Amino acid sequence: MKIGAQVWRALAKSCLLCATLGCLHFPGSRGGKPDFFETKAVNGSLVKSRPVRSVAEAPAPIDCELSTWSSWTACDPCQKKRYRHTYLLRPSQFYGELCDLSDKEVEDCVTNQPCRSQVRCEGFVCAQTGRCVNRRLLCNGDNDCGDQSDEANCRRIYKNCQREMEQYWAIDRLASGINLFTNTFEGPVLDHRYYAGGCSPHYILDTNFRKPYNVESYTPQTKCEYEFTLTEYESYSDFERLVIEKKTHMFNFTSGFKVDGVMDLGIKVESNEGKNYVTRTKRFAHTQSKFLHARSVLEVAHYKLKSRSLMLHYEFLQRVKSLPLEYSYGEYRDLLRDFGTHFITEAVLGGIYEYTLIMNKDAMEQGDYTLSHVTACAGGSFGIGGMVYKVYVKVGVSAKKCSDIMKEINERNKRSTMVEDLVVLVRGGTSEDITALAYKELPTPELMEAWGDAVKYNPAIIKIKAEPLYELVTATDFAYSSTVKQNLKKALEEFQSEVSSCRCAPCRGNGVPVLKGSRCECICPGGFQGTACEVTYRKDIPIDGKWSCWSDWSACSGGHKTRHRQCNNPAPHKGGSPCSGPASETLNC
């Protein structure tokens, strides 16, 4: 069933009419200053001139389209159910008709086939969760089953732990599955509240922690220096390729969905922080603005998971046990939606503070400044690189000039300066400390110290090493584990294709398309609005190329298979940048 088309389209027409009449409000990134002034060709920089709004017609609505229903599976002998599903062919966009939320169907059935789903348990079978635990864990005061059945009908409780101990910081988040296609944490897949009777204390900062059974190590890091790495980018294209895309990209796995090495955990592009970052920085695409990116990483702990005999969370355990043995994408897709695509095997916990100074090239040249001067002075203001005086001398800039640069940065919201924007991104710590840093002109030692103290007790997961979720399906817990594992791997391949934003139609003005469920949205750069980012004051904006979706893999030939994609979603025009990355991939087979 499709819903809400008339409402969406009426809203689209009213928004377009409102834009035509000039009643839309575009909030600027600087206090009170609109960010949608026309781009004049004065060395390519953004120069404020009399605005003329573009009223380009919004693209036609695109209706959501689902595939036809698959055939019903055979009746599953253990679940006594059969299944069918549909999948997304085309997402809705630009106020097109939405798809019915139901993309699978299940119905009861009868079969004479025997069910052999039980794994033999030599210990105690938990009443509700079905977990198998050692009998020595009964009546020990811990909820080893996850349903308290191991503590029921006890004449006496023999506690292993005689005193209360704390949970490791962020331990529940580390036990969650993670969707690496969207950089989001999902439901719990591991039980980090299970201790197998272990009660060895682990002291960190005078706090006594209890180590979960699944955890191999949780090592505190004692280095507490706030060192900044400052990097200069002479163009937006370099900044986008080396900074933005690394933060917001969707992982593109080629084979096996393995993650090689420890990697930075990016941000969710449709989150508030992701939208703010993309909107404000993309505003300066195809200008001659210069970028100074500063980054400080504070590590507070390193985490490592055991490599075998893991205790799964009972919710995940039951969901996997309820999967049909005959492959049905709809059921396996729901598991991936609810529990993610991967689980974390190693992690770095801590905080990241970073800011980006966006500088007007013409104003810098008029003031006889270089980006190196700004880098030295911004770093010197925080004491980076030793004595501030030595920093000034080393780069050949006077203390007065550095003072003027800092004044330009601090007064950018009050008057026109060579600083076009200061974009801050903070991860880790409490909301109060994050807010204080995010709205400060530049970080002070006092603010950084307060934030660092908060990060110790509220760390974010900033780097991870991960394995595909199907690696948790082992013969220890599941009958027919090899069949379920292969089904889950196949579903992961289909899921990657179905959730990719390459399915979305191009947004105008270099907007970023985001696929949310079965609907695409455009995240617009500053200076653009509308459902497709079609409303703007700017003219003749170069359009950067974006990739289409990958083709299916070819048949295996000569020990190799290939797939291809095209730079046509959209193709670059008006001097826009070409797509980065390969147009084809080849794998051994």
Swiss-Prot record:
Residues the record marks as carrying a glycan: 43, 69, 72, 550, 553
Residue numbers covered by the propeptide annotation in the UniProt entry: 32-53
Residue ranges of every copy of the TSP type-1 domain listed in the record: 63-116, 544-587
Signal sequence interval, chain numbering: 1-31
Effect of residue 569 to S: In strain: MSM/Ms
Biological role stated in the UniProt entry: Component of the membrane attack complex (MAC), a multiprotein complex activated by the complement cascade, which inserts into a target cell membrane and forms a pore, leading to target cell membrane rupture and cell lysis. The MAC is initiated by proteolytic cleavage of C5 into complement C5b in response to the classical, alternative, lectin and GZMK complement pathways. The complement pathways consist in a cascade of proteins that leads to phagocytosis and breakdown of pathogens and signaling that strengthens the adaptive immune system.
Organism: Mus musculus (Mouse)
One BP annotation, GO: complement activation, alternative pathway
Keyword set, alphabetical order: Calcium, Complement alternate pathway, Complement pathway, Cytolysis, Disulfide bond, EGF-like domain, Glycoprotein, Immunity, Innate immunity, Membrane, Membrane attack complex, Metal-binding, Phosphoprotein, Repeat, Secreted, Signal, Target cell membrane, Target membrane, Transmembrane, Transmembrane beta strand
Compartment(s) where it occurs, according to its Swiss-Prot or TrEMBL record: Secreted; Target cell membrane
Annotated S-S bridges: 64-99, 75-109, 78-115, 121-132, 126-145, 139-154, 161-199, 377-402, 502-549, 504-520, 507-522, 524-533, 556-589
Means of activity regulation: Membrane attack complex (MAC) assembly is inhibited by CD59, thereby protecting self-cells from damage during complement activation. CD59 acts by binding to the beta-haipins of C8 (C8A and C8B), forming an intermolecular beta-sheet that prevents incorporation of the multiple copies of C9 required for complete formation of the osmolytic pore. MAC assembly is also inhibited by clusterin (CLU) chaperones that inhibit polymerization of C9.
SUPFAM superfamilies per record: LDL receptor-like module, TSP-1 type 1 repeat
Domain MACPF residue range list: 157-503
Record-given protein name: Complement component C8 beta chain
Record-stated family: Belongs to the complement C6/C7/C8/C9 family.
Residues with the Phosphothreonine modification: 417
Subunit structure: Heterotrimer of 3 chains: alpha (C8A), beta (C8B) and gamma (C8G); the alpha and gamma chains are disulfide bonded. Component of the membrane attack complex (MAC), composed of complement C5b, C6, C7, C8A, C8B, C8G and multiple copies of the pore-forming subunit C9.
CDD domains noted in UniProt: LDLa
Gene name per UniProt: C8b
Effect of residue 497 to R: In strain: Mae/Stm and MSM/Ms
Superkingdom of source: Eukaryota
Region (Disordered): 570-589
Record's GO cellular component terms: extracellular space; membrane attack complex; plasma membrane
